[in-house]
Amino acid sequence: MTGAADRGEIDRAHPPGTSRYATRYVTVHGYRRAYIRAGRGPALLLIHGIGDSSQTWADLIPLLARGRTVIAPDLLGHGRSDKPRGDYSIGGYACGMRDLLTVLGIDRVTVVGHSLGGGVAMQFAYQFPERCERVVLVGTGGVRSDIHPLLRLAALPGSGPVLSLLTTASVRHIGWTVTRALRWLRTDLGRDVDDLMRTLEDLHVDTARAAFLRTLRASVDGHGQAITMLDRCYLAAGMPSLIIWGGHDAVIPPEHARILQAAMPGSRLEIFADAGHFPHRSDPERFRAVLEDFLSSTRPATYSARQWRDLMRSKGRHPDQRPAGSRSRSRRMSPAAGGETALAAASSTPGDTRGGEGPGVRGEP
């Protein structure tokens, strides 16, 4: 099957610092979706975070496209995709990823999600386990309620006019001055100022700002993150999973990485000690090496409707427990259909732990 987008509109212009690959467009359910497609081989789906776009992967796409098909979409309401009044829930985004892949003729993928995109990745694996081979979570949401206070405030009713003011040209100029100071003071938030300000720059457009608020309020309220994966981690078994986190993440605390790893027997954890919320931007070469090692040393998960049913019936009381050294073949999940996220994974690679032992942690020396 040839994707309709491959025969459709292609925008070959790209500003400095963005991906050198053309942005392609395809219409799904009446809305234009922007995406980047590069390379040939097993498919890798890269999902960005809230307020961001496929350009967050710009440095990685050329590296990952050597021997793989890389698909990096702009989520609905983000980047160059349409920004309608619509469903901006985690589940809605997961369905959007399924539909985009269907149009492009791609059946199965390894999915990599950053921040909000991690929640979408988990939801995709939960809703469509037959289409997911592996899951990679990068500074993902959906673990505990903790999140940066500014995001909690932005989720409150009445925050729209304030956000509109913050995205005016004069205030953005002040923001750049403040962020330079944050960087100079070596604060955790200062490590990500360029990426955070890039996100803020995009919100000066009314439709982008409205989509940002709808997306945020679908998963965050005044108390923090309103959805969690931890009560459904048992639903994933046999899905190779990798967790990557920045050691100085000021948006979602690094402690969430270890909480998530403990809930996912067999998963790998990589801590980028000097990175903030965007480890894939801070050190793209190391990120590529970690991801390539994970991909080459794990087998794609296989789907079994019977195993899936047994996991659901077990309610987590009887997880798949094979002797150490054996290879788990059951199917794994991610977020819950009601918008909650869930994830647990057991991979069969050296360095991972099996049989209920604590997973291995890898970080910078």
Describe the function of each predicted region.
Residues M1-A43, R66-R68, I106-D107, V193-D194, ...:
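Alpha/beta-hydrolase fold catalytic core
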Residues Y31-R80:
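Conserved HGGG/HGGXW glycine-rich cap/lid loop of the alpha/beta-hydrolase fold
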Residues R40, G247-D249, D274-G276:
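Acidic beta-to-alpha connecting loop that harbors the catalytic carboxylate
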Residues Y126, R134-T168:
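Flexible "cap/lid" loop of the alpha/beta hydrolase fold
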Residues V205-I259, I271:
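Conserved serine/cysteine hydrolase catalytic core
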Residues Q261-H277:
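Catalytic histidine neighborhood in serine/cysteine hydrolases
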Residues F272-R288:
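Catalytic histidine-centered segment of alpha/beta-hydrolase-like enzymes
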